[in-house]
Amino acid sequence: TVVVITGSNDLGRGNGEIHHEFSGKVVTSSVDENYIGAEVGSNNTAELTAFAEALRWCLKQGGEEEIVIKTDSQYAGNQATGKWKAKANRELVAHVQKLWKEVCELRKLSWEHVKAHSGHRWNERADHLAIRAATNDSPTSLSFWKPGQR
């Protein structure tokens, strides 16, 4: 699940405007056109897949402004940057690292860890989208969604 935010005030409460959001299940079939290397659907492959989707979105949008990806997954952030060595999900990690490098060639890119379940509005929105995608339910429209709502 990816929620793209612009204009966050960096006070840690997830203020700012949603620019784009998307969610879905982890693709594990190598014959699927959307396959990027996940062999199983797990929390880690979901976090890496979401990271990859955010990076792909950055590449499609173009632009020169700095990008900061905020995630509650230290695993995904550290795998994407190559700080941690992949022991599992190697093909998926390699794909994410390739995307990270591509975006870094175009603009300044970093990631920040956001504590999960701590009231960060947009992290809670991402959790809502992920749960709804996993259960094949449509997400609540942003107009009617409230933080903490599953």
Model-derived features: positions:
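RNase H-like nuclease fold core
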Residues: T1-T45, T49, R56-W57, R132, ...
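RNase H catalytic domain
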Residues: E33-G37, F51-L129, A134, L142-K146
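Polybasic, low-complexity binding patches
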Residues: G148-R150
